[in-house]
Amino acid sequence: RNAAGNRESAQDLSGFKEFFDKHSDMDLVQLSQCRSIEDVIRGLKGSAYYEPLEKLLEQGKATLPACETAMDMLYFKTIWKIKDKYLSKAEAKMLAQCFGTKMDMLNFQWICRAKKYYNLSEGDIYALIIPIQYHVTKKEIQTMAQAENMEQVYGVIKNSWYKCQNIEELMDQGLGNAAKELTDKIYELTSRKEPYSAAVLNSYLYFKEREIEQIITTIEKIRYGMTART
């Protein structure tokens, strides 16, 4: 974000240097000194992140939101690809439940945002969403991408597989709330069902990530003088 805004980094990242030197190909300190998105992407050369970001750069589409979406795509596709390789059958199934639900919910939200706020074309929507479906069918994705209004999109969501998970009732407080409720539920259920497996660690990390997101949101609201309800 500092690079995108051409701002100098004020954070001292030296405390993370040893960890990144051991576990990563990235030079975190050098990256923190970059003053543009282009510099950041070039600084990632040799890492797994470079190729998808370099493609955006070549297309002239290397904006901060586009880069964030590309990283989300890489994350989910990588997890989905390696889960069967490194995990037992039971653990892979558990991970599929958690990440599959998370991907479905994100695709619902991204499609709604694309239709409601940006009026993106069908092709642009396909490029935006995660190309993996769990309980959502390709036909449902296509119907939402081709929908003429938001009511049609919401209709598909409410009548999807997640209907049996009461998504319509949860959507009374917004799709974002429904997505969080359903995803939280899956992570909680898998950890309780398999208390001596990787499901517990997976659930722990998920809820820690949620806590961090809430802390960041709170800090940003304080920083920009926003109220708690904003």
Kindly give the residue locations of the regions a language model identified.
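Extended alpha-helical surfaces
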Residues: 1-230
